[in-house]
A protein has these predicted regions:
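Secretory-pathway ectodomains
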Residues: 2, 66, 79-89, 121-123, ...
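Structural motif
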Residues: 44-52, 86-96, 128-141
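Terminal domain-start segments
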Residues: 1-62, 144
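Surface-exposed, interaction-prone regions used to assemble/regulate multi-protein complexes
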Residues: 52-54, 93, 106, 111-112
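Short amphipathic beta-strand/extended segments with alternating polar/hydrophobic composition
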Residues: 59-68, 105-109, 129-138
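Repeated scaffold domains used in trafficking and secretory/extracellular systems
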Residues: 6-32, 63-76, 81, 106-123
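Short, Lys/Arg-rich amphipathic alpha-helical interaction segments
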Residues: 112-145
Length: 145
C-alpha cells in the first residue's frame, strides 16, 4: 500500500479535501486570501476560456493558467492547467505548493484528479491518454518561485 506524503503529512481524503473553482475570474476562497493569490486576465484563445497571469504573495509565476477548473488540494496545494506566457497551448498540468513556494509541471494535461487506494490518479476526459498515478508529491521535480 502506498501513502502519499506532502511535507511529511500523509495524504488521504480525511486531511486532503479537494475543491474546485469552476472559474477563477472574480472568484476567491480562503486559500486564495491566505496566500494572496492574484489573477490578472491576459488573453483568450480562439476556442474561448480566459487565460491569466498569476502572482502568489506578490511573486509572479513564470507561466500563465487557464481560469477554468482551478483545483485546491488540502490547505496549500493547487492544481492548474498552465501554458507558457503569451501562448494558449500546449497545456500542461501544474501543481503549486503555496506553503513552500514551489511548483512542479507534469509535462502532460490532466483534467481530473481523484484519490484512489491512497494514491492520486490524474486523468484527461478531453484527450485520450494514459492515466498518471502519483504515490508521493516528493517525487515531482519542484522549482522555486
Amino acid at each position: 500500500m502506498f501513502d502519499i506524503k506532502n511535507n511529511g503529512v500523509f495524504m488521504n481524503l480525511e486531511n486532503y479535501k479537494i475543491s474546485t473553482l469552476p472559474y477563477i475570474d472574480n472568484a476567491s476562497n480562503e486559500i486564495m486570501k491566505k496566500y494572496n493569490i492574484k489573477a490578472q486576465y491576459e488573453t483568450e484563445p480562439p476556442h474561448g476560456d480566459a487565460i491569466y497571469s498569476i502572482s502568489i504573495k506578490g511573486k509572479a509565476l513564470p507561466f500563465w493558467i487557464y481560469g477554468r477548473d482551478v483545483t485546491f488540494i488540502g490547505n496549500s496545494m493547487v492544481m492548474v492547467e498552465s501554458v507558457r506566457c503569451k501562448t494558449w497551448d500546449p497545456i500542461e498540468t501544474m501543481f503549486i505548493d503555496l506553503e513552500n513556494e514551489v511548483y512542479a509541471g507534469l509535462k502532460e494535461w490532466y483534467t481530473d484528479i481523484l484519490f484512489f487506494n491512497n494514491r492520486i490518479e490524474l486523468t484527461n476526459q478531453v484527450v485520450k491518454m494514459k492515466n498518471l498515478i502519483i504515490n508521493k508529491f516528493d517525487e515531482l521535480k519542484w522549482i522555486d518561485f
